[in-house]
């Protein structure tokens, strides 16, 4: 279970401009309000479905179960542009207090605008502030764009495979890269 987020973090948001100059808001998922509906709408229009380890699920019922799980068990960060959720990043605890898994999806109509980089940088800052040791993820080995973004933020490949790369972001001083 992830640690409880302090209110000053949950209520924080960041206003930026994407590469094309459109305003971009980053904020943490709120359980009260429209966030679940907005997140569901993003994933309904997300293509291709099941592109990353079967996610997001093609079937609506499975996708909604996955979204409810993330909303309740993870730290979720939303990217909002033009009144819509266009990106979603989340952290999940894998080893108590040590390792946290990272996932991110940016809607295909909003890729290559800096949304993924902004989400990843804000998640990294949060993890450092909360004292996490490391964040890890898996990414398709052919997804060069995503690998480039992760490396730019500080992730390194620690376990290449034929179809996937395991990447890790050390957050403590002295962690090997």
Show where each model-derived region lies.
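Acyl-donor-binding surface of acyltransferase catalytic domains
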Residues: 1-23
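A short beta-loop-alpha structural element at the N-terminal edge
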Residues: 22-41
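Acetyl-CoA-dependent GNAT
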Residues: 33, 44-103, 107
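Conserved active-site alpha-helix within GNAT-family acetyltransferase domains
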Residues: 117, 121, 141-159, 163-165
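Short, charged/polar, Gly/Pro-enriched secondary-structure boundary elements
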Residues: 172-177
